[in-house]
Amino acid sequence: MSMIYITLNIIAYVIDVRSLILDVRRLVFSLILGIVEGLTEFLPISSTGHMILVENILNCMDDSVIAFTVIIQLGAILSITKIFWSQLYGMSMICIKKIFFKQHDDHNHLCIRHIFLGTFPGIMLGMIFYEKIGLIFELTYIMYGLIIGGIFLLVGELCASKEPRVSRINNITYLQAFLIGCFQCLAFWPGFSRAGATIGGGLVVGLDRRISSEFSFFLAVPIIFGSAVLTLYHYRSCIGLMDVLLLIAGSATAFFIALFTVRYFLKIVKNVSLIPFAIYRFLLAGGIYWGLMT
């Protein structure tokens, strides 16, 4: 009996060690994805493309991992909320005053209507094709998305050379907001980049780089938040306590990395064109092509 007891204890110990090693690996993986998410979400280089590329490199591509990459975007969104809290709060108060207190401001303001018009096309398209979008999360589609998205950035830069440009975010019109929202639908193609679609789209419709970037960040809040919550609900039965802890770790990492990335990007984007980002996209697409061919 003592031998059986010792054997069972050894087996239990081995299982615990293996489980611990597996949990550590999952934690490291979640931190890596959080870093990648924070670095790429708000740059016009496709965060989804980078996340899927990392998942393929680490050989851990499955539906649950794809869901994880979507949900940890909540951390990146919280960074935008922190950076632009005063503007977001101001928009909300203007909306509340108009609806409940019938107060109208004669000055032009970026308001909830602009955000709604900028997100409405994406919401409608996402609701229609939600189940099918995941079918194109493959490296081949990402490669083409990177190339076409890079060309779109070059088109945006060509338009940016024309004057005059909208240089104050409060001067964005409803039509411009809606058109940028239509461009945002291009981001359903993995590799195209939501930031690339909206920033490039903003340049096409007459915004300067910084204002186009800021509006892109504002549009990210409802779109990414809605996508993450919908994905979380869809996979709710598959998420355990350990998964929740890993999501928190990945989201927290994405939050702090995105804080740095967004602030630095806003400092340089007014004087630095999007051409370097387009070149990077072409090089990354070439690397993916080389990897697929070897």
UniProtKB/Swiss-Prot annotation:
Molecular function terms from GO: undecaprenyl-diphosphatase activity
Segments passing through the bilayer: 2-22, 27-47, 65-85, 110-130, 135-155, 172-192, 215-235, 239-259, 272-292
Subcellular location: Cell inner membrane
Reactions mediated catalytically: di-trans,octa-cis-undecaprenyl diphosphate + H2O = di-trans,octa-cis-undecaprenyl phosphate + phosphate + H(+)
EC number: 3.6.1.27
Record-level GO cellular component terms: plasma membrane
NCBIfam families named in the record: undec_PP_bacA (TIGR00753)
Family per similarity comment: Belongs to the UppP family.
Note: Bacitracin is thought to be involved in the inhibition of peptidoglycan synthesis by sequestering undecaprenyl diphosphate, thereby reducing the pool of lipid carrier available.
Name this polypeptide is given: Undecaprenyl-diphosphatase
